[in-house]
């Protein structure tokens, strides 16, 4: 499938993210995510001590990348996992048989089998709730530092963000292009 110009994309601005997990909590509440699982979280990565006594670390969003060539879609035996016309990788819960193939195939390890329903679950940009009502995803709406941007790839504000040189996408050879863009920043803490 070709990378759609009108598809939905998200940008996680690591320069603005403070790792507060407000996005994780909002998602869990709205989507009734069971204890011990998540559709989105922010991880702290690359802690290292620099020679000047500063600690360097990075806040990284971990969620579905909405891959162009999603391995989770290609392994699904029932067609429950699919990429919709907006570029969102979805799970049709009525067709999911809980085989776990999509969970195992995800190169980013962001799917899980919901123990309450027995079907696969993951971030879908709140497509069936907030997005359907014309609102941005829950994570975007609660971010206190405006570190998350969401919109269609052909919108001017989104184009401005994704065109910056610091913006990158986490790639995996078998997934193709992904719809989660990131602006990298390494935070510092300590004495200079």
From Swiss-Prot:
UniProt cross-references to Gene3D superfamilies, sorted A to Z: 3.30.70.20
Broad class of the protein's primary localization: membrane
Residues that bind [4Fe-4S] cluster 4: 76, 96, 99, 102
Function: Component of the PhsABC thiosulfate reductase that catalyzes the reduction of thiosulfate to sulfite and hydrogen sulfide, with menaquinol as the sole electron donor. Proton motive force (PMF) is required to drive transmembrane electron transfer within the reductase. The PhsB subunit transfers electrons between PhsC and PhsA.
Residues annotated to bind [4Fe-4S] cluster 3: 64, 67, 72, 106
CDD domains: PsrB
InterPro entries xrefs: 4Fe4S_Fe-S-bd, 4Fe4S_Fe_S_CS, ET_IronSulfur_Cluster-Binding
PANTHER family on file: PROTEIN NRFC, PROTEIN NRFC HOMOLOG
Membrane topology: Peripheral membrane protein
Binding site for [4Fe-4S] cluster 2: 27, 123, 126, 139
An example Gene Ontology molecular-function term: 4 iron, 4 sulfur cluster binding
Cell compartment(s), UniProt: Cell inner membrane
Domain 4Fe-4S ferredoxin-type: residue ranges: 8-36, 55-86, 87-116
A Pfam family matched in the record: Fer4_2
Binding sites annotated in the UniProt record for [4Fe-4S] cluster 1: 17, 20, 23, 143
Note on cofactor: Binds 4 [4Fe-4S] clusters per subunit.
Quaternary structure and partners: Composed of three subunits: PhsA, PhsB and PhsC.
Alphabetized UniProt keyword annotations: 4Fe-4S, Cell inner membrane, Cell membrane, Electron transport, Iron, Iron-sulfur, Membrane, Metal-binding, Repeat, Transport
Name of the protein in question: Thiosulfate reductase electron transfer subunit PhsB
ATP-binding among keywords: no
Cellular-component GO terms for this entry: plasma membrane
Cofactor requirement: [4Fe-4S] cluster
């Amino acid at each position: 499938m070709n990378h759609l110009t009108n598809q939905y994309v998200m940008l996680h601005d690591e320069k603005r993210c403070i790792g507060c997990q407000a996005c994780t909590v909002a998602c869990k509440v709205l989507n009734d995510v069971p204890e011990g699982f998540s559709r989105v979280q922010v991880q702290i990565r690359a802690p290292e001590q620099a020679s000047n006594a500063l600690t360097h670390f990075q806040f990284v969003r971990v969620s579905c990348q909405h891959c162009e060539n999603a391995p989770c879609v290609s392994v699904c035996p029932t067609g429950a996992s699919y990429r919709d016309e907006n570029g969102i990788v979805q799970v049709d819960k009525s067709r999911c048989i809980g085989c776990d193939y999509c969970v195992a195939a995800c190169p980013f390890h962001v799917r899980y089998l919901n123990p309450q329903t027995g079907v696969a679950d993951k971030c879908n940009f709140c497509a069936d709730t907030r997005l359907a009502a014309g609102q941005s995803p829950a994570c975007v709406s609660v971010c206190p530092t405006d570190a998350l941007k969401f919109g269609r790839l052909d919108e001017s504000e989104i184009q401005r963000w994704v065109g910056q040189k610091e913006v990158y996408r986490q790639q995996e050879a078998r997934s193709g292009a992904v719809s989660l863009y990131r602006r990298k920043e390494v935070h510092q803490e300590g004495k200079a």
